[in-house]
Amino acid sequence: MSPEKAATSDDAVLGGRLVLRQPLRGHRVGHDAILLAAATVAQSGDHAVDLGAGVGGAGLALARRIAGVAVTLVEIDPVLAALAAANAERNNLSDRVRALRLDVEASAADFAAAGLAPGSAACVLMNPPFNVLQQPSPDHARRLAHAASATTLEQWLRTAARLLRADGVVTLIWRADGLAEVLAALDRDFGAITVLPVHPKPGAAAIRVLVRATKGNRAPLALLPGFLLADADGKPTAAAEAILRGGEALSLTGN
């Protein structure tokens, strides 16, 4: 379906700091994308790459938070890639944010031809597909966003390692019950791993993990105290509100 014919909605995120046009069906921008952007460290002049960017939620949130960061949104789905480009334009970020229709698992030559040479990124952020293929969504767009093979995570992290400069950092969000998969996939190229569990409320098991790792660094892993999205009554915590609506950064340093 063409971007012009796709049924979409215009949704404000970050307390209205961004307005995103996105399909009514399929994967939609939610807490995961905003948490991922908030946990990504970058500074003015850096080049960040958002792998599997969808309509650009995480990458655009990063660009909104940090002035001067250049962001490339990589997305395989043509409708979503077109929406990502349009969202950069409508939020007045197209001078620093561009969208590419490209498979994250494409070759180094394909990435270079698109202007993404090895070692060209200071940071990579990603929200990889995490549903096993035995349980795919019947919706095609949602299936592209969520369905994973046994090697998806490893392949995405290899792409990240190739794109990153020597001291570059990858940040990702993943299912909490898949943390072992993340650590195994990071082992080849990354170290100095920091893990932040994300809990829906006090006493509940983590539903997500935010993970940051540095290319070529072999420092030991750090497991941080969990981050709470809501209190026992279901009300968003002040920390969650500051990030999800206020656009603040989410520290993964343990401070």
Please tell me what each predicted stretch does.
Residues 1-14, 47, 110-118, 249-255:
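Short, low-complexity, intrinsically disordered N-terminal peptides in bacterial proteins
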Residues 36, 156, 213:
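Residue-level signal for inorganic ion chemistry
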Residues 39-138:
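Conserved SAM/SAH cofactor-binding pocket of Class I
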Residues 205-255:
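SAM/dcSAM-binding transferase cores
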Residues 25, 150-206:
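Conserved Class I SAM-dependent methyltransferase catalytic core
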Residues 2-43:
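Class I SAM-dependent transferase core
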Residues 19, 70, 96-98, 191-194:
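Conserved beta-strand segments of alpha/beta enzyme cores
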